[in-house]
UniProtKB/Swiss-Prot annotation:
Heteromer composed of three CRYAA and one CRYAB subunits. Inter-subunit bridging via zinc ions enhances stability, which is crucial as there is no protein turn over in the lens. Can also form homodimers and homotetramers (dimers of dimers) which serve as the building blocks of homooligomers. Within homooligomers, the zinc-binding motif is created from residues of 3 different molecules. His-100 and Glu-102 from one molecule are ligands of the zinc ion, and His-107 and His-154 residues from additional molecules complete the site with tetrahedral coordination geometry. It comes from the Eukaryota. CDD domains: ACD_alphaA-crystallin_HspB4. PROSITE patterns: SHSP (PS01031). The modification N-acetylmethionine is found at M1. This is Alpha-crystallin A chain. Zn(2+) 2 binds at H107. Disulfide bonds join C131-C142. The modification N6-acetyllysine is found at K99. Residues 153-167 have a biased composition (Basic and acidic residues). Zn(2+) 1 binds at H100, E102. SUPFAM superfamilies: HSP20-like chaperones.
Length: 173
């Protein structure tokens, strides 16, 4: 039986479990070399590993919480203004769309666009939905839940995005 022995320099850091930023929520912030060729980081040195914690922090926040009293969506949209964002409810779904036209940044010109669609729980009071954008770019979509005996109405309507002057105090989970 032949066993192939690989030098540790050619092993990929954490193998298939190594998180890739390629499809994360970056909205055009640029790619690093390790995003396209993640195995190169481990070929430099057998002891070099890209920080997993930094990768998680760099990915922005996209969190959905649903507890007994409310439904909450936290979405990092720091590159968009309230005018660039559209939030609407269609039946049992909330759709969040962000788009800004081409503008200049440090590296040239860039335009960004994203679509997110979330299913609302059936017991969310759709008449009391709210959406706000904090000063640090955190979009908060919130809806209280109704008692199980009450029925929430389902139709299409737009939810205005209000701007808050203070940064978000999004609790980490």
């Amino acid at each position: 039986m032949d066993v192939t022995i690989q030098h540790p320099w050619f092993k990929r850091a954490l193998g298939p479990f190594y998180p890739s930023r390629l499809f994360d929520q970056f909205f055009g912030e640029g790619l690093f070399e390790y995003d396209l060729l993640p195995f190169l980081s481990s070929t430099i040195s057998p002891y070099y590993r890209q920080s997993l914690f930094r990768t998680v922090l760099d990915s922005g926040i996209s969190e959905v919480r649903s507890d007994r009293d409310q439904f909450l969506i936290l979405l990092d949209v720091k590159h968009f203004s309230p005018e660039d964002l559209t939030v609407k409810v269609l039946d049992d779904f909330v759709e969040i769309h962000g788009k800004h036209n081409e503008r200049q940044d440090d590296h040239g010109y860039i335009s960004r666009e994203f679509h997110r669609r979330y299913r609302l729980p059936s017991n969310v009071d759709q008449s009391a939905l709210s959406c706000s954008l904090s000063a640090d770019g955190m979009l908060t979509f919130c809806g209280p839940k109704v008692q199980s005996g009450m029925d929430a109405s389902h139709s299409e309507r737009a939810i205005p995005v209000s701007r808050e002057e203070k940064p978000s105090s999004a609790p980490s989970s």
